[in-house]
Amino acid sequence: MKQFLRNCFSLSAQNRSTAEGRELTGNVRMKNLGFSPQLLRYFDDNSRRGRLEPADRQSEAENPVCGDWLVLTARVENQQLAQVRFQARGCVAAMACAAALAEALEGLPWEQADGLDLRAAILQRIERLPEASGHALELALTAGRKLFQN
């Protein structure tokens, strides 16, 4: 399983531009699919990818229809979400929603994060999500809610 995950992430990394100022391969085509430039930036952002070990909190969500999955891990220090990271396999929208969720949660006090309107926080960051990609938002919301369950 670990080797499978490494292969998935290395393939994903090959599809991204890493040089500052360069656009994502196929960016024009992605915009034509209804993805906002902000969503594409979150898809391309590696700053919160990965898994925290050890993690104080962890949640997982999977979409059995399309096979997308998401794992959130978090470190809690002084009742605050000090770090939030994600591992995901899925479409462009699933990766972008996961990255936006991790950014929205990181640094917030636990109680504020637990009460946060996750849907609004994600949509505020990615600006626009095509209707056909609603499953990606639901995946992130499910993992986000589970992070706060006992």
Language-model-detected regions and their locations in the chain:
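Alpha-helical support elements that line or immediately flank enzyme active sites
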Residues: 97-108
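Structured beta-strand/loop patches that form or line metal/cofactor-binding pockets in enzymes
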Residues: 41-85
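C-terminal binding/interaction regions
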Residues: 4-11, 21, 26-50, 59, ...
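Short, thiol/selenol-centered motifs that function as redox-active sites or metal-ligating centers
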Residues: 88-97
